[in-house]
Swiss-Prot record:
This is DNA-directed RNA polymerase subunit beta'. It comes from Deinococcus radiodurans (strain ATCC 13939 / DSM 20539 / JCM 16871 / CCUG 27074 / LMG 4051 / NBRC 15346 / NCIMB 9279 / VKM B-1422 / R1). Keywords: DNA-directed RNA polymerase, Magnesium, Metal-binding, Nucleotidyltransferase, Transcription, Transferase, Zinc. The gene is rpoC. Its cofactor is Mg(2+); Zn(2+). The keyword Lyase does not apply. It is an enzyme of class 2 (transferase). PANTHER family: DNA-DIRECTED RNA POLYMERASE, DNA-DIRECTED RNA POLYMERASE SUBUNIT BETA.
């Protein structure tokens, strides 16, 4: 399966999940605690996942391989290898669908984007707190049609589905309510007491507490008043006057009887005289009840008369019933009227028929119910109020009208009530639409949609307004919507929205359109984001193992699966039992949460934790992402066999290409090879024997060790020291067997590994195959990696003791006794020496020529003679003498001649070129030795250089040991004039303080002057220390160590022997009180305390720096790993201008850049224009600049001015660079090879020195208003992440003349362009804290900073161009590295910057498929535009700058992005798009276990055949010269078809 070149990721369909599965897991059980065998249908079931034991079924009926493939009829287990349990999957069928949380919680949510739902809305639907409309039909909400996909709360759903009804409780204290039963009320209307209706609707009483029946009474009665006093008319209306009395009147009883009165209102009564009922013993109450007696007479008493009898009173005939005095006005009461008034013709009373309403109140208790509606007419004898107890029922005493009062509650509903006469045509619960028949043979029709409630008693049809529509909750609803989604229609709709004028709407439509197109193009069905079936991982990937004590340790996944299965089974059971909807809904929500926890625990809500601890369980997502996830832990970083680890110790006797491997370790590492050799030698006959032999006899049999020596003879091993910050962190060495248990390391490779011998450990690996061995030997051997890939300088160079020894040997002694004296002749000078007036090395003048007594006294005919004199003690190695060499006399020292011989011996056969390497005039310190190594590499090649280094190492160590140099406290010599310098400083300090007291300066100026004073004083003391050492103590061990570069820098020497000087506060600002003492003198308590500040800050910085630097390296590798040399020449005609200097603004002088800066800018680059020197020499266009060329250009910088070169920034190769644009491979000092992984090299070159960079934020001294300037590592990170700087400079946004107006707190800046229409319309406000760097009226260019501060690279891109942004980023990163003395070639930074600027933002998609606002690589826009037909509008774009993190995640390779950061987001996006990874970069190939498409992994190299010289001659090949690096293997990478430019999406 290694033969594939693309990998696609997509969303799995339910069918695909079932296809993967070998059976359904139905039970949550794992293994039986007694038998320890998997339970059937459980999470470890052998029938589903395969047998636990190789080729053995569960019951043991079938054993051995011969039954392979057979399924046991007894236990149902297939007989096969137990390895299948690592890849056989199962599945769980869910009782209800569940959403995949990745597509829900990703930002933006994929499901939400498609359905146009916000994250919050989608969550409400999925977790059962809102309904979503799936089929709206003709439902209405708030007067508008209901939309598909609209969310409804529980209440809204109930209201729309079943009608809105609200019940309002009326307190007992309310006597009566404000509204009548059946009245329409409006929102805010008072119903009763303080109760207010919250909606418009029909109000109905619920449980009235009392009823009042108004009976209509009408009886004939006498009006015993004189007829002449009454107004003569037949009828009297309510309130009409009956009579105005002119005399007193009395009404008397016509008969004897019991009085019964009817109240007619307003004191008017109808008096009935009734016959009394005789009481009997059994029914006293009945006897006393006058109603039951017969009416004997009725008398009408009008309003205005005074009644003189009481209810129930027994009176005699003639008794006074009522009276009225003269002048009284008698009238009909307002609640009654009179008709049929008859006046007697002769004698007798007036008779009238009186009509009135008699109100009878009936209390209603909870056991009673009203049978008629409020305001209904009742007839005499009608059952009005029913009751459980028949005797409590209320029967109407007469015809009348009933009113209900004091309801316990009022029901307000959106409904319409229709009264009917005939039979209704609908029944309770029916649904009707507008126009549907209700009753009366179809004459009564509904006006609204709704649900029917019949009131057969009152003969009413109530239509409660509601609608028949579908709305659901949970993933089931979402799945239905996704299933019905028409992507073509949606795309058309969104394309229309993209034409909207609103930018916000266009941005939203673009996001939705991208997702829609992704689903269309990938063939994914959107509904697959909802799971109906959950796959179950193979059991061996979620194992369960028995630990001590009989307990089981299990993978967290098993707990999560168990939880899911339990909930799923419970839901199935509840659904089959018909449980209430609320319970089912809750269970479905819990099932969704169980699926969420399994896929991504903790993504929503609080994570599921381990019982008994707070540790959250590791879900499937946790297995993928993070440092411990599958990508980074297992795919990109595997543990390998044939490896070991041990402490390292120095091996000074080793050659550069060797390392010492402990015997025991080698025995284990080379075991397979050893077995083979022992077998070949006949020591053993098989592997088993060989293994036994090694275990038992390895210490007693020499043959084992002899065989081991033979095995390792032509092998190399790899040594690695963590952290592996650059490629030199792993190098190959030939093993040398050593005693002990430590790995021995060559001292010179320590720098590359950053190793020291204070307990460091290193890992050792054995390349197994012949190809691996060959590759390791050719490309990784320590002696083949002498130059640093970062800057091309030797990284293997003499250091420490070696430098010290050689420096001591080649140093010249200079004595001061009699120095500078002039003598007429050599004899005079020697005479003075003999008299003791001169020392042997005192410089004197003889006949105007400088010499010394040593040079005059000693002239040796050859080096041997000089060295013999040293042995005899006549002279020292450092004495200045004359020595004849190759027929020429040199004024030098015996030491230098000895050094020359040492180098010559180290070079061996190539020692003839010694004069090009060793200069007898030079004292060899660190840099001189480094230059010598570089020269050797250039002239003599790698092998000779490795030999030279070994020779220098051996000689240097020997000399360092024999010289006996060491330091003691007495070697720290204080300068004699330190006291004077401090006294001067104190005097100046007093002046500054005095000026401040007098008000001549501000606090800020005083502080700055004090700091400057002490800085100057510290420098003066430092100079005094150095002068003292160089003049008086040139051979002081401390001075020698510092001067030679072996150990100790000038700052350390200054602090030891001079003064410590100013210290920093933790915030980086300077404390103005200096430490005057040196360490030699000792610090006072205060001085010690002051110094602890900075020291602690330093310690904290180092810890932080290491982590930040490592993370930066990782981000850089991720952004650039795909950049490989893929072509010979991309044909780019663009060039980058590299200025060699600049004109000083203040002096107007032209100043050249430093030599090292010019080197890191142009070394190894291809010229795009001729370079002409002042002497007429020309380097032609197309040449690559060697180090000699660069040094010559640096010398003639003023004449040349600038150089035009090709850089990776302008390279046109997709996902890589070409050889011409990249230039030299700095580690080989020659043009880069095809397939070189220059992106990774660039990332390592920038990241590896990151730890050396300071963390410091440079503070302006704690003074208010001074901004912080970010420096060091944070500044590098800020630049590579393209962040807005902390203190940002204001940049000119156009070319023109600047106009500055000053205000109190700010400047107002306006730029006048040459063309008036382009001038600034509004002024830019600049705070005064930012100092202006230009003056009013000055000419400025677009992109030019006009204030102090760091420029935002995005501004440069916007106002100027891509080139300006690129150069700025490169220069700013270099500024930080140079400030720390770190050399990194510009091209490495350019490779990274190119990756940051490869993106563009589409401003107008034109007729292409690209969308406005989309971020794509620029070649994609070009490709899309090229594909257009003539006349179509191409897409337009603007460049964008992405930080390295963003750029890494936006990459085309989903494997690379997912293994970097935000794994779930990347995989979600990629699977939605059905993204194909073309496996162009390195990481994706490493993940898949393929050879990387770089170096020897290139197809062109893999197809290359190895041939010896004879074969080459046979085929007539030209040159047969072999290269040390390729070991005689050559291939022509310029042949046609060797370009490996990838075609994305081909």
């Amino acid at each position: 399966m290694k033969d594939f070149n693309k990998v696609r990721i997509a969303i799995a369909s339910p069918e695909k999940i079932r296809e993967w599965s070998f059976g359904e897991v139905e039970k949550p059980e794992t293994i039986n605690y007694r038998t320890l065998k998997p339970e059937r249908e459980g999470l470890f079931d052998e029938r589903i996942f395969g047998p636990i034991k190789d080729y053995e079924c569960a019951c043991g009926k079938y054993k051995r391989q011969r039954y392979e493939g057979k399924v046991c009829e007894r236990c149902g287990v297939e007989v096969t290898s137990s390895k299948v349990r690592r890849y056989r999957m199962g599945h769980i069928d869910l009782a209800t669908p569940a959403a995949h949380i990745w597509y829900v919680k990703d930002s933006p949510s994929k499901i939400g984007t498609l359905l146009d739902l916000s994250a919050g809305q989608l969550e409400k639907v999925l977790y059962f707190s809102s309904f979503i409309v799936t089929k709206p039909f003709n439902a209405q909400k708030d007067g508008r049609p209901l939309k598909r996909g609209e969310l409804l709360s529980d209440d809204e759903y109930r209201e729309l589905r079943f009608g809105r009804q609200e019940t309002y409780t009326i307190p007992n204290s309310v006597e009566d309510v404000e509204i009548r039963d059946g009245e329409y009320v409006t929102r805010g209307q008072i119903l009763g007491g303080n109760v207010v209706s919250k909606m418009d609707g029909l109000a109905q009483y619920r449980f009235p507490r009392r009823a009042v029946i108004a009976y209509s009474e009408g009886v004939e009665a006498s009006l015993p008043l004189p007829a002449d006093t009454l107004v003569e008319q037949e009828t009297f209306r309510a309130g009409e006057i009956l009579a105005e009395l002119e005399q007193d009147v009395q009404i008397t009883a016509p008969v004897a009887g019991t009085v019964f009165m009817h109240d007619l209102g307003e004191d008017s009564v109808m008096i009935e005289l009734r016959e009394g009922v005789e009481a009997n013993d059994s029914d006293e109450e009945e006897a006393a009840d006058p109603i039951r007696g017969e009416v004997l007479a009725r008398v009408y008493v009008p309003h205005g008369m005074n009644v003189q009898v009481a209810e129930g009173e027994v009176i005699e005939a003639g008794a006074l019933l009522a009276d009225a005095s003269e002048g009284a006005r008698l009238r009909v009461s307002r609640d009654s009227n009179l008709s049929g008034v008859t006046f007697p013709k002769k004698k007798g009373d007036v008779t009238v028929t009186a009509h009135w309403t008699r109100r009878v109140e009936y209390p209603i208790d909870p056991t009673m119910h009203v049978l008629v509606g409020d305001g209904s007419e009742v007839t005499k004898g009608q059952r009005v109020i029913g009751a459980i107890d028949k005797e409590e029922e209320v029967i109407a005493e007469a015809d009348g009208v009933i009113t209900l009062h004091q309801p316990a509650s009022i029901l307000v509903s959106k409904a319409k009530v229709y009264a009917y006469d005939d039979e209704p045509l609908v029944v309770n619960g029916d649904r009707v639409e507008p126009g549907d028949e209700l009753a009366d043979d179809g004459n009564l029709r509904s006006e609204i949609s709704g649900r029917i409630e019949l009131d057969l008693v009152r003969k009413q049809v109530r239509v409660i307004e509601s609608y028949d529509f579908e709305a659901k909750m949970g993933a089931e609803a979402v799945k239905e919507l996704l299933d019905e989604l028409n992507l073509d229609e949606l795309e058309t709709e969104l394309n229309e929205q993209m034409k909207d004028n609103s930018r916000h709407k266009r941005a939203k439509a673009r996001k939705r359109l991208e997702v829609t197109r992704s689903f269309k193009a990938s063939g994914n069905n959107p509904s697959w984001m909802i799971l109906g079936t959950v796959p179950v991982m193979p059991p061996d990937l979620r194992p369960m193992v028995q630990v001590d004590g009989g307990r089981f340790a299990t993978s967290d996944l098993n707990d999560l699966y168990r939880r899911l299965i339990n909930r799923n089974n419970r839901l199935k059971k509840l659904m089959s039992q018909g449980a209430p909807d609320m319970i089912i809904r809750n269970e479905k929500r819990m099932l969704q949460e169980a699926v969420d926890a399994l896929i991504d625990n903790g993504r929503r809500g609080s994570p599921v934790t381990n019982p008994g601890s707070d540790r959250s369980l590791r879900s499937l997502t946790d297995l993928l992402g993070g440092k411990q996830g599958r990508f980074r832990q297992n795919l990109l970083g595997k543990r390998v066999d044939y490896s070991g680890r041990s402490v390292i110790v120095v091996g000074p006797q080793l050659k550069l290409h060797q390392c010492g491997v402990p015997k025991r370790m080698a025995l284990e590492l080379f075991k397979p090879f050893l077995f083979k050799v022992l077998e070949e030698k006949g020591e053993v006959t098989n592997i088993k024997q060989a293994r036994k032999m090694l275990e038992r006899y390895r210490d007693t049999r020499d043959s084992v060790w002899d065989a081991l020596e033979e095995v390792i003879e032509d092998k190399v091993v790899l040594l690695n020291r963590a952290p592996t910050l650059h490629r030199l962190g792993i190098q190959a060495f030939e093993p040398v067997l050593v005693e002990g248990q430590s790995i021995q390391l060559h001292p010179l490779v320590c720098e590359a590994f950053n190793a020291d011998f204070d307990g460091d450990q290193m890992a050792i690996h054995v390349p197994l195959s012949a190809q691996a061995q060959a590759e390791a030997r050719i490309q990784m051997l320590a002696s083949h990696n002498l130059l640093s890939p970062a800057n091309g300088e030797p990284n293997v160079k003499p250091s420490r003791d070696i430098i010290l020894g050689i420096f001591t040997l080649t140093q010249l002694r200079r004595d001061n006794l009699g120095a500078g004296t002039e003598y007429a002749s050599e004899a005079d000078a020697l005479a003075a020496f003999d008299e003791g007036k001169l020392s042997l090395n005192s410089p004197v003048m003889v006949n105007g020529v400088e010499t010394s007594p040593g040079r005059l006294r000693y002239t040796f005919s050859n080096p041997d003679e000089a060295l013999h004199a040293v042995e005899q003690g006549e002279i020292d190695h450092q004495d200045h003498v004359r020595i004849r060499l190759n027929g020429q006399v040199y004024e030098t020292s015996a030491g230098r001649v000895q050094f020359r011989r040492m180098v010559q011996e180290a070079l061996g056969a190539q020692g003839g070129l010694i004069d090009t390497l060793v200069d007898l005039e030079t004292t060899y310190e660190k840099d001189a030795l480094k230059d010598m190594v570089m020269a050797c590499f250039k002239h003599l090649g790698i092998e000779a250089t490795a030999g030279l280094l070994d020779g220098l190492k051996e000689g240097g160590f020997k000399l360092s040991t024999t010289s006996g140099i060491t330091i003691g406290i007495d070697d720290i010599v204080l300068p004699p004039n330190k006291g004077e310098l401090l006294a001067e400083a104190d005097q100046m300090l007093a002046e500054i303080e005095q000026n401040f007291e007098f008000g001549f300066m501000t606090e800020e100026e005083r502080y700055k002057q004090v700091v400057q004073l002490w800085n100057n004083t510290t420098d003066a003391v430092k100079d005094a220390v150095f002068e003292n050492f160089s003049k008086n103590y040139p051979f002081n061990p401390l001075w020698i160590m510092s001067q030679s570069g072996a150990r100790g820098n000038p700052q350390q020497i200054r602090q030891l022997a001079g003064m410590r000087g100013l210290m920093a506060r933790p915030d980086g600002s300077t404390i103005e009180v200096p430490i005057r003492a040196s360490f030699r003198e000792g610090l006072t308590v205060l001085e010690y305390f002051i110094s602890t500040h900075g020291a602690r800050k330093g310690g904290a910085d180092t810890a932080l720096r290491t982590a930040d630097s490592g993370y930066l390296t990782r981000k850089l590798v991720d952004v650039a790993h795909e950049v490989v040399v893929r072509d010979v020449d991309c044909g780019s005609t663009d060039s980058t201008v590299m200025p060699l200097g600049a004109t000083d603004e203040r002096t107007g002088e032209w100043r050249s850049r430093k030599g090292s800066e010019i080197e890191t800018s142009i070394y190894g680059r291809t010229l795009t224009a001729d370079v002409e020197f002042s002497d007429g020499r020309v380097i032609p266009e197309g040449e690559m600049l060697s180090m000699e060329d660069v040094k010559a250009i640096a010398k003639d910088a003023k004449h040349i001015g600038e150089v035009f070169v090709r850089t990776p920034l302008n390279c046109r190769v997709k996902a890589g660079v070409c050889q011409k644009c990249y230039g030299y491979d700095l580690s080989q000092a020659k043009p880069v090879s095809m397939g070189e992984a220059v992106g990774v090299v660039a990332a390592e070159s920038i990241g590896e020195p990151g730890t050396q960079l300071t963390m410091r934020t440079f503070h302006t001294g704690g003074i208010a208003g001074g901004g912080d300037i970010t420096m060091g590592l944070p500044r590098v990170i800020e630049l590579f992440e393209a962040r807005k700087p902390k203190t940002q400079a204001v940049v000119a946004d156009r070319d023109g003349v600047i106009r500055i107006e000053e205000e109190e707190e700010r400047y107002l800046v306006r730029i006048e362009a040459d063309d008036e229409q382009y001038s600034s319309k509004t002024a830019t406000k600049v705070p005064r804290v930012l100092r202006m760097t230009v003056k009013d009226g000055e000419r400025v260019e677009a992109g030019q900073p006009i204030t102090r501060g760091a420029v935002n690279p995005h501004d440069l891109l916007m106002y100027k161009d891509t080139d300006a942004a690129q150069r700025y980023l490169v220069e700013e990163v270099q500024r930080v590295y140079r400030s720390q003395g770190v050399k990194v070639h510009d091209k490495h930074i350019e490779v990274i910057v190119r990756q940051m600027l490869r993106w563009v933002e589409v401003t107008d998609g034109g007729d292409t498929t690209l969308l406005e606002g989309q971020t794509v690589e620029h070649w994609e826009v070009d490709q899309a535009n090229e594909a257009l037909a003539e006349g179509q509008t191409p897409a337009s774009w603007k460049p964008v700058l992405l930080g390295i993190t963003k750029s890494s995640l936006t990459t085309k390779s989903w494997l690379s992005a997912a293994s970097f950061q935000h794994t779930t987001h990347v995989l979600t996006e990629a699977s939605m798009r059905g993204q194909v990874d073309d496996l162009i970069g390195l990481k994706e190939n490493v993940i898949l276990g393929k050879l990387i498409p770089a170096g020897t992994g290139l197809l062109t190299v893999r197809e290359m055949q190895v041939a010896d010289d004879r074969t080459l001659e046979k085929y007539g090949e030209g040159s047969t010269s072999s290269d040390a690096v390729t070991g005689g293997q050559r291939y022509d990478d310029t042949r046609p078809g060797s370009s490996i430019n990838p075609g994305y999406g081909d």
